[in-house]
Regions:
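Class I S-adenosyl-L-methionine-dependent methyltransferase module
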Residues: 79, 91-92, 98, 102, ...
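A short, acidic, amphipathic alpha-helical segment used as a generic capping/interface helix at domain edges
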Residues: 249-262, 290-295
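Domain-level detector for long C-terminal conserved domains
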Residues: 219-221, 225-229, 243, 285-287, ...
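Short catalytic/ligand-binding loop motif for oxyanion handling, primarily in non-cytosolic enzymes
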Residues: 152-156, 278-280, 315-317
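Short alpha-helical segments and helix-capping/turn motifs at coil-helix boundaries
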Residues: 126-134, 291
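A short N-terminal interaction module
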Residues: 1-106, 110-117, 121-127
């Protein structure tokens, strides 16, 4: 990728008229701005313009859709100018970001070699709504299993409080409150019971490891203090109620888990949120095959459910979908903000 220096202090990148790729950080800046985070968008745009000052980082992210580690450096507090920029959410972006990228090029490149971890607790509102819809079909506890669980914070979803368009659910005394902007029909409010919870991740984060928790916090956008506080509280709950997350590959773990004995009167429920986008075509095929084979074995006493919170194939929307076996019918319950900030509920319960 040809990296070019640009103008200073938040000036836009030149209009390419679609002829030149503006660069991975500029593309991400556009996406982040559209998702409501102008400060992080400005940081990324400045990073694109100043990328020539960090050759190791530039080489690493060429054609690679991951974010840079500026948030982690700001949180660490070692770079006073960067920390000040993040604290004030304004300033000379190009000067500060450029100097930081030049000074911390090796650190940023090394930090980016590990997979991103965004255990977004805000998505649990959509998952909880889907679980309550499922409970209206099968009045039984669920055996909750999560693919790509990260630190396993979503496995504690029954320990959080929810406000779904004025309809409350979950634990009202919880320090974690998830209240997305709700549009559409009211959700079906049902008490859910989690018989057991377990997840899998290629590199699960240990909630008792301060460095791992700090890394997770660094993925929260700097201008979203509410998200950061919610994550901090979810980590506190997780330390009191440690989630069980296996280290493993989804495509190998899922078939084994689905083949395990299932108690009668328990709905085996598989959840995945923004996890399948990291699989290649063969990985997707393996997941679909595992669900199809397990679905063929499901019955009314031992049902199987799949809750997906994923981008569409065109990556133009995030859909919340529920598939229930033995009938195998998939319902598009809602369209959602990628981090759960709003939910447009479509399901009528029919």
């Amino acid at each position: 990728m040809a990296v070019r220096p640009g103008p200073m202090h938040g000036a836009p990148l030149p209009d390419t008229n679609g002829d030149i790729d503006p660069g991975p950080l500029a593309r991400q800046a556009t996406a982040v701005r559209e998702m409501g985070s102008p400060f992080v968008a400005a940081v990324l745009a400045a990073g694109e313009r100043q990328l020539y000052r960090a050759p190791r980082t530039a080489a690493l992210i060429a054609d690679w859709p991951r974010d840079v580690a500026a948030d982690a450096l700001a949180r660490a507090g070692h770079d006073t100018a960067l920390s000040d920029l993040y604290r004030r959410l304004d300033g000379d972006f190009d000067s500060v970001i450029g100097a930081t990228m030049h000074a911390a090029d090796a650190h940023i490149a090394e930090w980016m070699r590990t997979p991103p971890q965004t255990n977004e607790v805000g998505r649990t509102a959509a998952i909880m709504a889907a679980l309550m819809t499922l409970r209206s079909r099968f009045d039984m506890p669920c055996e909750l299993r999560e693919l790509g669980a990260s630190a396993g914070l979503n496995l504690n979803l029954d320990r959080y409080a929810y406000d779904l368009g004025g309809h409350v659910a979950g634990d009202p005394a919880s320090s974690v409150r998830v209240a997305p902007a709700w549009h559409g029909a009211a959700p079906l409010i049902r008490p859910i019971a989690v018989a057991s919870a377990r997840g899998v991740d290629l590199s699960p984060l240990d909630v008792t490891d301060a460095a791992a928790c700090e890394r997770l916090m660094a993925f929260i956008w700097a201008d979203e203090a509410d998200r950061a506080e919610r994550l901090a509280q979810a980590l506190r709950i997780a330390r009191a109620h440690p989630p069980v997350v296996d280290t493993g590959d989804i495509t190998r773990w899922l078939p084994t888990m689905l083949a395990a004995p299932q108690a009668a009167g328990v709905c085996r429920t598989i959840v995945h949120s923004m996890a399948l986008q990291y699989l290649d075509a063969s990985g997707h095929a393996a997941v679909e095959r595992a669900f199809a084979e397990a679905g063929a074995r499901a019955n009314a006493d031992r049902p199987l459910a799949r809750i997906g919170f994923e981008w569409t194939a065109a990556r133009d929307a995030v859909h919340l979908c529920l598939t229930i076996w033995p009938d195998g019918v998939t319902r598009h319950l809602a369209t959602c903000h990628a981090y759960g900030a709003w939910i447009d509920w479509h399901d009528t319960g029919a």
